[in-house]
Design a protein with these regions (language model features):
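Conserved catalytic core of nucleotide polymerization and phosphodiester-bond processing enzymes
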Residues: 1-266
Length: 266
């Protein structure tokens, strides 16, 4: 008999959502990026546009940690340069981005047993870890250079507690996350990265699915996902739903995560 994996329900929901996304043609308009198409990079992107289908067709099994990959001939939403994203327009009226503030860092903080800061996490680090001795950008660089390296920083370790998190989810060979995702043959060098990235992306997908369900029966829909961010194709007469979407998205199993909301025509 086949035993259902612990994360079966979540993967089922993710496939439902990504299949629906793949059925929605993108509205591609090259006018906003015409000035970029003269470069070699721009010409290559234009050739890609002619070759691929204008849909976001994800592969949920494409990476060991659960990050989405793209199926062949999918629109390259995950890998295209940010400057070219302006060619993607909403089919309704607005593209709304819901983006977690420093999602992986917040996940690590939660796994270490700490409460979520309500404000920007890098500002919070400046005050609570670095005693206001550096700028936000300096704190961000210092934190991320420490996060996935062997560098020591007692102040960061005190709150983020990498060793505790690694030892809780990794047995020296295998990782099992809170979401029931299992990764085998993981060495110490990759263990923390896999734990944090995998837990974060499964949490993001779970929150995105809640927004997806919230929009059922509406004109607005989940247009696509880019790593830790969800993009909504929003109808103007449903714009009041943004408040509920934001409230739904930010309430994670690890506490309320700060979310940045932005909206535009592309």
């Amino acid at each position: 008999n086949y035993e259902r994996p612990e994360n079966y329900d979540q993967m089922y929901n993710l496939i439902l959502m990504t299949n629906k996304i793949a059925s929605q043609p993108l509205n591609i308009d090259i006018d906003p990026i015409k000035h970029l198409l003269g470069s070699v990079k721009g010409q290559n992107f234009q050739r890609t546009l002619q070759r691929v289908r204008h849909v976001c067709d994800y592969n949920p099994w494409g990476t060991v940690t659960g990050r989405l990959a793209a199926n062949p001939n999918s629109f390259p939403i995950l890998t295209m340069s940010k400057e070219f994203r302006r060619c993607v327009r909403p089919n309704n009226d607005w593209l709304v981005e819901l983006d977690f503030n420093a999602a992986e860092l917040r996940t690590l903080l939660a796994l270490a047993g700490q409460e979520q800061p309500k404000n920007d996490i890098h500002d919070w680090n400046v005050k609570n870890i670095f005693n206001s001795s550096m700028t936000r950008d300096e704190a961000k660089v210092k934190t991320f250079s420490w996060l996935y390296s062997s560098k020591e920083n007692k102040d960061l370790e005190r709150l983020y507690n990498k060793d505790f998190v690694r030892n809780k989810y990794w047995d020296g060979f295998k990782i099992k996350t809170d979401y029931g995702r299992i990764m085998d043959n993981v060495d110490e060098h990759h263990a923390l990265n896999y734990i944090v990235q995998s837990t974060t992306i499964d949490m993001v997908h779970e929150q995105a699915y809640k927004v997806f369900k919230l929009l059922e029966g509406m004109k607005s829909n989940v247009a696509f996902l880019i790593h830790d961010a969800v993009y909504i194709d929003l109808a103007n007469d449903e714009r009041q739903a943004i408040v509920k979407m934001l409230d739904t998205f930010k309430k994670t199993p690890y506490g309320d995560f700060k979310v940045t909301v932005s909206a535009g025509k592309h």
